[in-house]
């Protein structure tokens, strides 16, 4: 144990929980410098006042690359500028409850990912994500997005494996919206077999699922739907329901 402690101390590793909820705790976090590259613990950040300097907080957050435990970020308040975990590549779990667009553009792997639905979230960038245990929008399991979201980028995600075999993605029903699911397959990560994934999508004007094979698809408010490999069976393993109010091509 002593050898491990010395090894962690010699590298860019912070051991223990990192809590930032005031100007003084932010100052303490700044003093850790590069040791925040890997947090061997949890990260708890509450930003609800301009007393916490947003620029300084962003500098600290941008040092965090890997969190062994949980990341919890709460952001609210008039005039309070939110921060992004722009360098975070992996975490045990993440919960974001913020009043601003979500950018986790470097995130590759995470356990449970909860992004609480809020009217001020207009975009969700998970463009590097390749592995996630589950999504949650704060009230519903296996759900991501919200009524004001105009863009969701899951362009690197190859599979969503949950016992429920279901995923719900919600975007705004007005204006132009984009949804990137370019690599989403219905192949089980562990067995390599094609397994059913029920996908419910609201929005995503030009919805393309080039690798999606098996499951029930429900699409609302889409203009075009591309399913080159989808096996339609008109049964419980391959139904297709499309609300045609904006549909131009399928």
Annotate the PLM regions:
Residues 12-25, 40-51, 62-84, 90-101, ...:
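Concave beta-strand-loop units of leucine-rich repeat
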Residues 31, 59-64:
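Beta-solenoid repeat scaffold
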């Amino acid at each position: 144990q002593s050898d491990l402690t010395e090894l962690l101390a010699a590298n860019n590793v912070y051991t223990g929980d990192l809590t930032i909820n005031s100007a003084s705790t932010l100052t303490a976090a700044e003093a850790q410098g590069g040791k925040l590259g890997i947090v061997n613990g949890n990260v708890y950040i509450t930003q609800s006042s301009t007393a916490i300097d947003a620029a300084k907080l962003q500098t600290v957050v941008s040092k965090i690359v890997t969190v062994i435990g949980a990341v919890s970020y709460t952001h609210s308040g008039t005039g309070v500028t939110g921060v992004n975990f722009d360098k975070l590549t992996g975490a045990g779990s993440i919960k974001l409850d913020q009043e601003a667009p979500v950018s986790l553009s470097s995130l590759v792997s995470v356990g449970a990912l909860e992004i609480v639905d809020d009217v001020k979230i207009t975009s969700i960038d998970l463009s590097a994500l390749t592995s996630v245990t589950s999504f949650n929008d704060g009230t519903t399991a296996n759900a991501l997005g919200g009524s004001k979201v105009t863009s969701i980028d899951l362009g690197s995600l190859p599979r969503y494996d949950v016992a429920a075999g279901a995923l719900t993605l919600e975007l705004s029903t007005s204006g132009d919206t984009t949804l990137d699911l370019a690599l989403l397959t219905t192949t089980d990560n562990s067995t390599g077999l094609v397994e059913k994934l029920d996908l419910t999508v609201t929005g995503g004007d030009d919805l393309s699922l080039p690798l999606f094979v098996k499951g029930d698809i429900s699409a609302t408010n889409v203009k075009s739907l591309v399913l080159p490999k989808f096996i339609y069976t008109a049964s419980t393993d391959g139904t297709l329901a499309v609300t045609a109010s904006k549909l131009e091509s399928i």
